[in-house]
Structure formats: structure tokens, C-alpha cells
Amino acid sequence: IRIMKNRLFLSVLLVAFVAFGQNPIEINYVKNQDNSVSFYYKKIVPGSYLVQVYFEELTNTRAANSETKVIRNSSGQLLTLKPERAENQIGFRFSYRYFKGDFNSKVRSNFPYILPFKKGKKVIPKELYSIENIHFNSELPKNWKAYSFDFTKEQMVKAIRKGVVVEIVNHYTADTLRKIDYYSKNNSITIEHKDGTVASYQGFDKNKIKVKLGEIVYPQSELGGLAKYDSRSLYRLYLTVFYYETVQGKSLQKIK
């Protein structure tokens, strides 16, 4: 079953990831015997990250003042500075920052996704619109799609595609004593796919999430049970599939 005939992707503006506690990414360097300098990274969180390294006071090298790379593994080599004069060392100072996501990846726009429920179950997806479109009558963002699914009984949500769990939010409890139109925050599971697309599933009971951070899931893998939405007999899933990209015409190097 194809859940999406159109491209269900949300073009997300570049937003810096703010780390709390231990840094999810660390970069160190080694000075080699040939006077080159190799930079290595360690990543303690799952998923892809875009890393930007900035250099100041570069001497004895023709290297650029900044380097940008998407990293996916837990560790590896990031880049190497080579000396212009092999007999002398390279002088430098460096800093770095990182952003969550596989930016400007080669997305498979015609990939067939399956429904996020038990095989053979009949469901009616409701297409969602942006706030700007609803309240300001503006045009829909290009390549933007999201859906909700409503049920009168609890449902088990399943993965629509193979991927790795990159984020789990399980802090919230629904208000079941009154009717609620909309929650600004929901318990959610975020899964990154091989081509850089990301699926966000929202609406879980915080005690019924079945996956762990970093776990690989497959189509029809159980993710978790939906929470009762409010005082009604209503269980609702919000599903969004998107990818990360920079603003058209704006270089990563110019984003501060």
C-alpha cells in the first residue's frame, strides 16, 4: 500500500542543534610525522549530523578556512590538513559546530511507504496543513505533507520503512478529563532512513513505547501504542516525513 503518491517531505530550515550535558560530538586532532594534521570525530548519539569545522590563523597550508561534512558513523576521520612546506609544521586554531540531520541528501522521492499499522487494516488518513495556510490563507509549502489517523480504540503503531531510531520523547501525559483540540507537544519517535529522510510519529502513550534509541527498525516493526487523546474515545497518530536541506541559494558557510 502506498501511503504517499506525492512527495511527503518537509523542507526544514537549518537550525543549530543545542547540546545539553555531554557533547554528542567531539573532534580532536593528531599531528603526523609528515607535519600533516588529521582530525577525527566521535559521535555518541545515533543518526546523521552535519559538522562544520572553522580554522583561524592558518599558516603553512593551502587548506580552506572551513570544512563541512555529514557524519553517520560513531567515529572516523573528518579531514586532514597538509603542509605547504613539508619541513615545517602547520599553524592553526579551530572551532566547530554541528547540526542534526543529513543535509541535502539524495532523497528517493518516489519511495513507496507502507501504512503505519497492522498489515491489512483499513484506515483513513487525514491530510494536515500548515498553520500559515489555515490562518493566513497562504499557499502550502512545496513538498510538504503530513497526515493524522484517528481511532476509537488503542492501536499499535508500526514502522513505515527501515531506519534507525534517532529520538524518543516520552515525557507527556494526555488530559483525559476534557476535550482537547490540539497539543503543542506529544510523545514521539523519530526515525532516520537510509536516504536521509526522517519519519516523525507522534501520539504515543509514554509507557507503551517499544523501541530504544539507536535501534534499527524494519517495515511493520512495532513502535508503540497510542495514548488516549482526551476525554473522548479517541486515539490519534500524527505522521510526518521530511528531509533536511539548506535554504535555496544560501551557502552553509554563510550561516552563523
What are these regions (language model features)?
Residues 22-75:
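Cationic-aromatic interfacial patches
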Residues 1-26, 41:
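Bacterial Sec-dependent N-terminal signal peptides
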